Regions:
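Extracytoplasmic gate region of multi-pass secondary transporters
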Residues: 2-48, 55-58
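Intracellular juxtamembrane helix-capping segments at the cytosolic ends
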Residues: 109-124
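Short hydrophobic/aromatic, small-residue-rich stretches within specific transmembrane helices
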Residues: 47-51, 134-135
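Helix-to-loop junctions at the C-terminal end of transmembrane segments
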Residues: 57-70, 152-153
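A membrane-interface helix-boundary motif in multi-pass transporters
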Residues: 147-169
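Multi-pass alpha-helical transporter architecture, strongest
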Residues: 162-182
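Helix-loop junctions at membrane interfaces in 12-TM secondary transporters
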Residues: 90-100
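Structural signature of the two symmetry-related core transmembrane helices
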Residues: 72-87
Length: 182
């Protein structure tokens, strides 16, 4: 299946989607503590904001994707998610940071489903194989976590944001790629 360029691109998309998801959920409290000097108890609420937005996005995605194709939504969602991620180092308050986090989660929450759905739509006769491949890509998302650790040690909080930007930028490029092939 990895010989099929479209399926390969979507598989890498799953890897970056999972990596960004895990990265954000782990990095949010650290970022709040290190950049904004928020105490540990309050910083622990950051992931709650992230997961509330992801939950809302999952429900909205079920409604939106019943009416609009994932190929049309994918680049728009990732573009807004990328912009919100890029804004993180520029905002000056914990509240503004959490607003950015909420927007990122809202926009990127359905990236896994979009990658998988688009790959299956492209090669429907290989649904089982694609599904197995995508599940394996979930494990690969752990590679991004390792990169986050390296980036944090080398560049601090900005390094974390840099790795997350790369993940979401790939997803944006993937969305544009999918839109052109739809």
């Amino acid at each position: 299946m990895l010989r099929h360029p479209y399926v390969l691109a979507m598989t890498v998309g799953i890897l970056f989607s999972v990596g960004a998801d895990v990265g954000f959920s782990v990095a949010i409290p650290e970022y709040l503590k290190n950049v904004y000097k928020v105490d540990l108890n309050r910083a622990g609420m950051g992931p709650t904001v992230y997961f509330v937005a992801k939950t809302i996005a999952a429900f909205l995605g079920a409604v939106v994707f019943a009416k609009v194709s994932a190929a049309k939504c994918f680049p728009w969602c990732m573009g807004v998610g990328l912009a919100a991620t890029a804004a993180i180092p520029l905002v000056g308050t914990p509240l503004a940071f959490l607003v950015c986090v909420f927007i990122v989660a809202l926009m990127t929450a359905n990236s896994f489903g979009m990658c998988m759905g688009l790959a299956i739509d492209r090669v429907p006769e290989k649904t089982n194989e694609i599904t197995a491949l995508m599940v394996m890509a979930i494990v690969g998302g752990g590679l991004v976590s390792a990169l986050l650790g390296v980036a944090q040690r080398a560049f601090g909080a900005v390094g974390i944001v840099g790795v997350l930007l790369v993940c979401i930028a790939y997803l944006l490029a993937l969305g544009l790629f999918a839109q052109k092939r739809a």
